[in-house]
Structure formats: C-alpha cells, structure tokens
C-alpha cells in the first residue's frame, strides 16, 4: 500500500514537471508565433505530454469542425491539454481572468487571444458576448466548461452555470458536447496525485438546439451526464 502511494506520488511529480517545463517551452514559441493563427501550430505541441508520460488518450467519435461552441466537463488541467493537442481548429478558450494574470504561465492565454472573463464585473456578460462575437467572426470555435470550475471526477457533474447557455442562445450556435473521463486520475494538482488509469475523450454528435425550448440546456446536461456515466463505469468497473 505504501509503495503504491509512493509510486503515485512520484508519477504525479514527474507529470507535473512535464507539464510545467513543456508549457514553458510552448509559451516561448507562442510568443514568436502569436500572429500566425494565434500560435495554433506551437500549441499543438501539447501532444508531447502523451509520448513523454506514456499516457494513452482513448478518443471516441470525431471532431466536428463546423461546430461553433464546444462544451465539456472539467476535472483537471489536462482537459485543456487534451483539446489543444488534438482539435483540428484554432479553438478559443473561455477562462477566468485570474488565470491570465498568473506570472509567465498566464501568457499561454493572453498571447493566444483567449477570452478572459471577470466574474466580479457586473457588466461582465456584456464584455463576454462582445469578445465571443469577435472570436466567432475570426472563425474560432469557442470552448467552455459549463460547470465553471473543476469537478471531483466522480459520477456526478457539477451543476451547469448559465454562461454557455447565454452564449449559445445569443449567437444561435451549433454545439458539440464532449465528455472527459478520468483526466483527474491521470493528473490532479490539488492534491498532487497521478494514477495508472485509462482516460478517454468522447466527442458526441453536434447539433443546433431548439432554442425556443425552455429545457434545451437541461437536456444537454442530461445527455452529457448519461454519456459520461456510461464510459465512467466502463473505465472504472470497481467503483460501481
């Protein structure tokens, strides 16, 4: 038991170093490449995480390059790495303003033209919608975590916040839902943990919701939750 705990700790430290050093290198390349499609080519180097750590990301489904809004659950820093590594488009993340203010590492967001929102600003929704329109006009798909913060990686999602709903309805967007399973087991920063586990990205079929339906957003959450549970139980049979 103690040896397993030590092994998990060492694995977590190694993966943290890979992320920290790898991201630092990517940020430097992003700076020089920032005017070229928001440094999308250098951002793809996130895929090196998998070869350097031996992690195999199982992918089910396909990316819909016509989808304008991507919604996915949030468990780990790796969720961003997963999509940055493999999504074919110049995606634009919607993130908390505080993340862009982190010394040096905040440049991963600011140098690449991501949307940073101030949750304390009462006019924040106006600024958010203005920024979203700008990115959509640049033909950049938007990516948002509807839970608003990291979940604990168990069976249940956190309640979806209204941000994704407001954006989708305002611009009548085609949505591609995605679910991530076990990314928190591959790397968890608080507490620092990493396990040998299978991890999976499931890309659901995209669609344009019936925005006249008052329940479309709840139905989206139910659909994602159902799909997540199916794969969660498949990858974690001992937890049923």
Curated annotation (Swiss-Prot):
One GO CC annotation: plasma membrane
Keywords: Acyltransferase, Cell inner membrane, Cell membrane, Lipid biosynthesis, Lipid metabolism, Membrane, Phospholipid biosynthesis, Phospholipid metabolism, Transferase
GO molecular function: 1-acylglycerol-3-phosphate O-acyltransferase activity
GO biological processes: CDP-diacylglycerol biosynthetic process; phosphatidic acid biosynthetic process
Enzyme class at the top of the EC tree: transferase
Key word Cell membrane present: yes
Membrane topology category: Peripheral membrane protein
HXXXXD motif, short sequence motif: residues: 74-79
EC number: 2.3.1.51
Domain of life: Bacteria
Main localisation: membrane
Metabolic or biological pathway: Phospholipid metabolism; CDP-diacylglycerol biosynthesis; CDP-diacylglycerol from sn-glycerol 3-phosphate: step 2/3
Compartments where located: Cell inner membrane
Catalyzed reaction equations: a 1-acyl-sn-glycero-3-phosphate + an acyl-CoA = a 1,2-diacyl-sn-glycero-3-phosphate + CoA
InterPro entries with a match to the protein in the record: AGP_acyltrans, Plipid/glycerol_acylTrfase
Family: Belongs to the 1-acyl-sn-glycerol-3-phosphate acyltransferase family.
Domain notes: The HXXXXD motif is essential for acyltransferase activity and may constitute the binding site for the phosphate moiety of the glycerol-3-phosphate.
Stated name of the protein: 1-acyl-sn-glycerol-3-phosphate acyltransferase
């Amino acid at each position: 038991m103690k040896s397993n705990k030590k092994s998990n700790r060492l694995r977590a430290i190694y993966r943290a170093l890979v992320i920290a050093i790898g991201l630092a290198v990517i940020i430097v390349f992003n700076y020089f490449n920032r005017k070229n499609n928001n440094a999308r080519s250098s951002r793809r180097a996130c895929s090196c995480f998998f070869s350097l750590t031996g992690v195999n990301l199982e992918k089910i489904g396909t990316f819909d390059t016509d989808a304008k809004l991507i919604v996915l659950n949030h468990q780990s820093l790796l969720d961003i790495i997963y999509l940055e590594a493999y999504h074919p488009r110049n995606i634009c993340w919607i993130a908390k303003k505080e993340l862009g203010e982190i010394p040096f590492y905040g440049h991963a967001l600011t140098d690449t033209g991501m949307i940073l929102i101030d949750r304390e600003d009462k006019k924040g929704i106006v600024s958010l919608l203005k920024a979203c329109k700008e990115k959509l006009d640049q033909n950049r798909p938007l990516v948002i975590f509807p839970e608003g913060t990291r979940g604990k990686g168990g069976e249940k999602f956190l309640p979806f916040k209204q941000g994704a709903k407001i954006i989708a309805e305002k611009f009548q967007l085609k949505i591609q839902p995605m679910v991530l399973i076990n990314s928190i087991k591959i790397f968890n920063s608080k507490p620092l943990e990493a396990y040998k586990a299978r991890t999976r990205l499931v890309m659901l079929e995209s669609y344009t919701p019936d925005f006249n339906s008052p329940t479309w957003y709840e139905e989206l959450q139910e659909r994602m939750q159902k799909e997540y549970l199916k794969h969660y139980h498949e990858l974690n049979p001992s937890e049923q």
